[in-house]
Amino acid sequence: MATKEKLQCLKDFHKDILKPSPGKSPGTRPEDEADGKPPQREKWSSKIDFVLSVAGGFVGLGNVWRFPYLCYKNGGGAFLIPYFIFLFGSGLPVFFLEVIIGQYTSEGGITCWEKICPLFSGIGYASIVIVSLLNVYYIVILAWATYYLFHSFQKDLPWAHCNHSWNTPQCMEDTLRRNESHWVSLSTANFTSPVIEFWERNVLSLSSGIDNPGSLKWDLALCLLLVWLVCFFCIWKGVRSTGKVVYFTATFPFAMLLVLLVRGLTLPGAGEGIKFYLYPDISRLGDPQVWIDAGTQIFFSYAICLGAMTSLGSYNKYKYNSYRDCMLLGCLNSGTSFVSGFAIFSILGFMAQEQGVDIADVAESGPGLAFIAYPKAVTMMPLPTFWSILFFIMLLLLGLDSQFVEVEGQITSLVDLYPSFLRKGYRREIFIAILCSISYLLGLTMVTEGGMYVFQLFDYYAASGVCLLWVAFFECFVIAWIYGGDNLYDGIEDMIGYRPGPWMKYSWAVITPALCVGCFVFSLVKYVPLTYNKVYRYPDWAIGLGWGLALSSMLCIPLVIVILLCRTEGPLRVRIKYLITPREPNRWAVEREGATPFHSRVTLMNGALMKPSHVIVETMM
């Protein structure tokens, strides 16, 4: 088919099936207009709404507490080499791919794949399982941050001293630790920090293991409820509310991060901390774990393979130049991660100098940085209350907009599955309330005395890098080798007016799948069972449960393939050919070949069948 004819075919296809009718919101279906139903899908009121929503969605806690630690751990500046390879080879291509197919189809994370390639619609279901599990445990971090924030409004921070009911006789304040004449006569093995005791004995009330859940922590349960209520009211009116909330939640954290950066750089010992953060160790590049960490960090920080970016893109206008903004947002995301390292390690360098220890002894990642290392650091600064409040507000806002953007993506994907039912009246709002309530109840298991063990189990398995790599591989495979990268480029040209450089197309076809397969295999080879604090070993049943969480998403893709092939009658070759067609071919021609047409929820065009340009599909045509 000539290029001009193929492009015209794409334009006609989008005008008839995907493009919104005049005066209607994107995604409004003809049958709903005939019935006099209200518009089914909103659109962003301005471009900045989309930009800030995406920025809020993927600039989150991982940028502040995970990237700097991984950079220090994996060779300092040398870590940037694998990081940028994965960034340009997989992160940006998959990020743009998810946004653009959402914009092109005006559908959420599940139904967009039903339009593009019904046989692989399990990609959308896998994404929704991952993001549903992620939404249950990610918000628990915000509950902890809320708890710390409430306790920060005191003249003396409660984790700075040992005179509280939760402290043990072994508790020793850091002021005594810094008194060398007193400290040399004591054994460090017998004493603990008040910061650690506040975290483990007051916040968590940590039990002996996951098989000993203990009682519910009502203070944390109330904090969790508060955060879920805030999340609900941020998204309950759809993009009309989300697009306005992000004006504050996505911008204010950058201002606070800048303040913390300036403060950190002015502290004594900051230079040593930054040197420790960036000093390159090229020899570390020979360790496969360094490359695994780089790959998984890219997928985590760009919030890809969760369906959220596709859902956000589905609210764009058809002619919106999302390619340009996706590249700018990528620079913002990775730049934030890099700058956060200066803010964090300058303060860790100050801590190390104040305590007279090596920086490696105070460097932490994840909750250890947010709830142990940094709270300890602020107790050593002038005006500790002010810096504590500032830090935990920043954490809350960074995490909150990521949370409600991911929940919005989850809601959009599910509502698009059943639009005729869930978009009537206030059913969408009721559905959001039900979904948030279920997630809250599941999250209560993580605010018990054994909740930290459950939290780590979800974090290690449910939304692991292995799951994300699995989904990313199939996304790129379907677009590049079944739908056709050139065909999608034709659609992109129709939307934004020009074709992106070949880098994206080649990444979808070769580079991203190769990186995903390599990282996936090495992740399985280097796998070690989960432990807590490198001491507590999870029982076998808990490890099995963790793998069950991981497989619950990964198995969606092959299961949907099997189910659809079984539901479609006819020779296997004809069934596969029909199910990989991005629109409904002529019904009579298909039935003549002995296949029963696949009945998707999506209404597809009869007749015109655009022939994909790749060999794998052409051999079946």
UniProtKB/Swiss-Prot annotation:
Which residues get glycosylated? 163, 179, 190
GO MF, one example: gamma-aminobutyric acid:sodium:chloride symporter activity
The UniProt entry's GO biological process terms, in alphabetical order, are: amino acid import across plasma membrane; modulation of chemical synaptic transmission; neurotransmitter transport; positive regulation of cell differentiation; taurine transmembrane transport
Localization (cell): Cell membrane
> How is this protein positioned relative to the membrane?
Multi-pass membrane protein
Family, according to the entry, reads as follows:
Belongs to the sodium:neurotransmitter symporter (SNF) (TC 2.A.22) family. SLC6A6 subfamily.
This molecule's function is given as: Mediates sodium- and chloride-dependent transport of taurine. Can also mediate transport of hypotaurine, beta-alanine and gamma-aminobutyric acid (GABA).
Q: Which organism is it from?
A: Mus musculus
Spell out the GO cellular component terms annotated for this protein, sorted alphabetically and separated by semicolons: apical plasma membrane; basolateral plasma membrane; GABA-ergic synapse; microvillus membrane; plasma membrane; postsynaptic membrane
What does the pH dependence annotation say?
A: Optimum pH is 7.5-8.0 (for taurine transport).
Name of the molecule in the record: Sodium- and chloride-dependent taurine transporter
- Give the principal location in a single coarse category: membrane
- Give the compositionally biased regions (Basic and acidic residues): 1-18, 29-42
**Which top-level group of life is the source organism from?**
Eukaryota
Instruction: Give the Cytoplasmic membrane side ranges.
Output: 1-49, 566-621
Q: In which tissues is it expressed?
A: Widely expressed. Highly expressed in the ciliary body of the eye.
